């Protein structure tokens, strides 16, 4: 692993003078094998990101896992394509994941307001968002990636490029992903998501004077997410859950005990306030306080973007139309952008239900907002990477503006709310695509790949991702609309979008709790805490955030066992591959299980006896930890022996 990128990749030279890693020979990395493998990876990352993101509220950028796994695939099936083939596979992986991380923020909200999603509607807004996002990104490609080389670092692009350059050291990536897939799949097979044979929730709840709840869902998928995102994010999310379950929940429980007889919960007249249990408090109160914190975080994030928006627009307008030394004509880019605009207007007419004025005004506003935030998203990716891109903040700001347009014109029916959210799904997809595009194209620039080839492969993967994500959401529709404290899919961002738009349109938003959440968010911001991360932890079940923290702790432990920097790098690569497998295996098997349950092929029985106890869940936890830690430690020993 002694190969490195040139130091010029990190700056010090003008972008037009940068000499890429590959300077001679064929600049194309694609062939039918690479395309097929990329489509498979796009489907895999799109489905697993949609499933895990709707459950945990977190999405994991696929660029680095895709680069590691892609290295193994190219080594096994397309050696001649080398590093440029690996580059295309990481880009296609990112394309599938990027679409999912955008669409799941808004599209499920249509279901949450009681409306239905047609496959055509979901496909149309997704395709329009992909094409428009890629099209606008190509217009600022030279400015963001070439002219700003060294000023915008694109940290995750550099990490992906370094991983690909040193890819001889990660030849075991496919093996570790396969092991992770197997572990995740087998455990998921026996839990509620499939056969429902064993309990995998460790649960301790107190319903007396000091009400609290501590739970851990033994989930390979969530443990894998925790390993990938690391300690800082996991700890902040868990802090939000601690605040919700051990401070705010007991406080509400204490004061509710003094409520008068006959007083009932505001949204559930069958439950007396003085008799509320932990689940009632979580579902009727904590949820809306959490939504307020998320709203606060989103608006603060949007406000902080104002200087970036101004800078981005100014520099984009003043940038040279074409930097010298860039390759190929922009013909394909213009076609993609034009197709995105045309499909956007056609989609606008379809989802507006025949309201021509709504279609014209809202599509125009959505295109303006999407264009603005696509530029901002591409620039911010150069600073913080796609993993930390404030997509939710930009989406909330956009939705608030579109909602105000709807209210101003009197478009306030439930059907209008559905149209509003579908326009929002278009905007968020375009915003997310900008991050995926600029990050993948920066890798191509650093390595010496073809710009047009990456655009083509990335766009195809993203369109495949749209089909996959919309199909996944429709298959899971019955599970996604379930409400309560212990639902399988918490949908934090989609719930926020539904609550926000429906509340503004109907005027029935529980403002008292929302404002409490907003004030808490401002308090977190003043303490310099990541508001949205803490807010998601507050909103999610503690069972979800606790196992994510366990995954981060496992990574911390594995890192501590490294005997050298090289050993640490090898363990990190192995751990990410294994974790990607855990996420993919659990998600795919979970999806298959739900499909089989819905179609009546399998009928899970009720868990009874020892299999239903906390002891059973603890045993599964022990097995999972022993397998993951044991495999990674053993791999570290083998790596050391090889050296």
Task: Say what each PLM segment does.
Residues 1-643:
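Alpha-helical multipass membrane-protein architecture
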């Amino acid at each position: 692993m002694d190969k490195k990128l040139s130091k010029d990749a990190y700056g010090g030279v003008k972008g037009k003078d940068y000499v890429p890693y590959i300077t001679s020979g064929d600049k194309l990395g694609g062939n039918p094998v690479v395309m097929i493998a990329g489509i498979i990876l796009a489907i895999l990352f799109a489905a697993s990101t949609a499933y895990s993101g709707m459950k945990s509220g977190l999405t994991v950028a696929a660029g680095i896992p895709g680069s590691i796994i892609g290295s193994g695939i190219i080594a096994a099936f397309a050696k001649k394509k080398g590093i440029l083939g690996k580059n295309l596979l990481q880009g296609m992986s990112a394309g599938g994941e990027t679409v999912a991380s955008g669409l799941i923020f808004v599209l499920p909200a249509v279901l949450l307001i009681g409306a239905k999603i047609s496959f055509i509607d979901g496909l149309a807004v997704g395709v329009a968002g992909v094409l428009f996002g890629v099209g606008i990104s190509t217009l600022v490609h030279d400015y963001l990636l070439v002219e700003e080389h060294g000023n915008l670092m694109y940290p995750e692009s550099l990490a992906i490029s370094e991983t690909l350059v040193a890819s001889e050291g990660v030849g075991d990536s496919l093996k570790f992903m396969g092991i992770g897939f197997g572990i995740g799949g087998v455990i998921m097979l026996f839990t509620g998501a499939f056969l429902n044979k064993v309990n995998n929730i460790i649960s301790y709840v107190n319903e007396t004077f000091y009400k609290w709840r501590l739970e851990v869902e033994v989930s390979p998928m969530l443990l894998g997410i925790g390993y990938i995102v690391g300690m800082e994010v996991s700890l902040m999310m868990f802090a939000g859950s601690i605040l919700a379950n051990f401070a705010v929940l007991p406080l509400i429980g204490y004061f509710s005990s003094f409520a008068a007889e006959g007083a009932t919960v505001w949204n559930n007249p069958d439950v007396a306030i003085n008799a509320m249990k932990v689940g009632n408090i979580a579902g009727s109160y904590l949820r809306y306080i959490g939504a307020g914190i998320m709203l606060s975080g989103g608006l603060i994030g949007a406000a902080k973007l104002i200087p970036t928006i101004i800078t981005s627009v100014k520099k984009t307008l003043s940038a040279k139309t074409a930097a010298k030394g860039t390759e190929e004509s922009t013909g394909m880019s213009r076609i993609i952008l034009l197709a995105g605009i045309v499909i956007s207007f056609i989609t606008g007419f379809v989802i507006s239900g025949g309201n021509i004025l709504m279609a014209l005004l809202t599509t125009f506003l959505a295109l303006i907002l999407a264009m603005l935030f696509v530029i901002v998203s591409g620039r911010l990716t150069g600073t913080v990477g796609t993993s930390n891109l404030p997509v939710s903040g930009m989406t909330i700001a956009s939705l608030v503006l579109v909602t105000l347009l709807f209210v101003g014109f009197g478009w306030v029916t439930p059907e209008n709310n559905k149209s509003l959210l579908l326009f929002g799904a278009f905007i968020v997809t375009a915003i997310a695509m900008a991050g995926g595009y600029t990050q993948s194209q920066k890798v191509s620039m650093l390595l010496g790949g073809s710009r047009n080839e990456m655009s083509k492969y990335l766009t195809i993967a993203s369109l495949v991702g749209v089909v996959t994500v919309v199909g996944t959401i429709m298959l899971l529709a019955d599970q996604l609309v379930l409400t309560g404290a212990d639902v399988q899919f918490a949908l934090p961002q989609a719930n926020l979008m539904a609550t926000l738009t429906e509340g503004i349109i109907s005027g029935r938003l529980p403002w008292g709790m929302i404002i409490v959440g907003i004030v808490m968010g401002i308090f977190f911001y003043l303490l310099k805490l990541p508001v949205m991360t803490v807010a998601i932890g507050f909103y999610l079940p503690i069972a979800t955030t606790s196992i994510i923290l366990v995954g981060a702790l496992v990574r911390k432990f594995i890192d501590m066992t490294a005997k050298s920097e090289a050993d640490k790098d090898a363990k990190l690569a192995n751990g990410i591959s294994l974790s990607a497998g855990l996420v993919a295996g659990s998600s795919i098997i979970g999806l298959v299980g739900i499909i089989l349950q819905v179609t009546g092929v399998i009928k899970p029985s009720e868990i009874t006896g020892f299999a239903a106890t906390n002891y059973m869940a603890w045993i599964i936890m022990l097995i999972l930890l022993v397998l993951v830690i044991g495999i990674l430690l053993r791999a570290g020993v083998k790596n050391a022996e090889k050296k």
